[in-house]
A protein has these predicted regions:
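P-loop/Walker-type NTP enzyme "switch/lid" segment
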Residues: 1-49, 104, 154-157
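Active-site donor-binding loop signature of nucleotide-sugar glycosyltransferases
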Residues: 15, 38, 143, 147, ...
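Short, conserved glycine- and acidic-residue-centered signature motifs
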Residues: 29, 86-89, 170
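Charged catalytic carboxylate motif
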Residues: 35, 92, 173
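Conserved catalytic-core segment of NTP-binding enzymes
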Residues: 45-149
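C-terminal boundary of histidine-terminating zinc-finger modules
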Residues: 155-176
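C-terminal alpha-helix
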Residues: 176-188
Length: 192
């Protein structure tokens, strides 16, 4: 299931069509929210499998797979599009996180919020950024990912943007974000 990539120390597990029936297949399982956590924990406890980070990319909808990912995680990195309905969606996500913390995963926390699809020519992007920074303050990363045509094109070519065009503004922003994230991680690690 795990696939090596062209990047050293980066493995991936891709989604597949079999996951679409998961909700129906597990309908009678009272512990279904813990299926991913159980499997992931068992896999990671094998000493031959050492990973610094496990990232789970979730769809914006609140499906069983998303709940499983939230139950399996210790922290969240929330991408927030700087668009009209994004803050409303974030409010819903916050309510969901609180419910999951109460009943399924008390250790879940938001690591940070990454503003994406930012268009400096658009007043709405600036307004969403301001509201996010006012409300979530230090949780919002300094780096902002701009709206960029190369970011949109890369998936249609079956490539991450960092391979498709590592010099485009979107790629440069993701590199900056990675630096910011890792610097934050080293600060958290040294404070522990």
């Amino acid at each position: 299931v795990i696939k090596k990539t062209q990047f050293e120390n980066l493995d991936i597990i891709t989604s597949n069509v079999d996951l679409s029936g998961l909700e129906v297949e597990t309908a009678d399982d009272s512990n279904r929210a813990f299926i991913l956590k159980t499997k992931l924990t068992a896999y990671l406890n094998d000493s031959r499998r050492l990973y610094d980070y496990v990232l789970i990319d979730c769809p914006p909808s609140l499906s069983l797979l998303t709940v499983m990912a939230l139950v399996s995680s210790n922290s969240l990195l929330v991408p927030l599009q700087t668009e009209f309905f994004a803050l409303e969606g974030l409010t819903q996500l916050m309510k969901t996180i609180e419910r999951i913390k109460v009943s399924l995963n008390p250790d879940l926390k938001i690591r940070g919020i990454l503003l994406t699809m930012y268009d400096k020519r658009n007043k709405l992007s600036s307004q969403v950024e301001k509201e996010a920074r006012d409300y979530f303050s230090e949780k919002v990363y300094s780096t902002v990912i701009p709206r960029n045509v190369r970011l949109s094109e890369a998936p249609s070519h079956g490539m991450p943007v960092l391979i498709y065009d590592k010099t485009c503004p979107g790629s440069k922003s993701y590199f900056s974000f990675t630096d910011e994230f890792m610097n934050q991680e080293s600060t958290i690690g040294s404070a522990a």
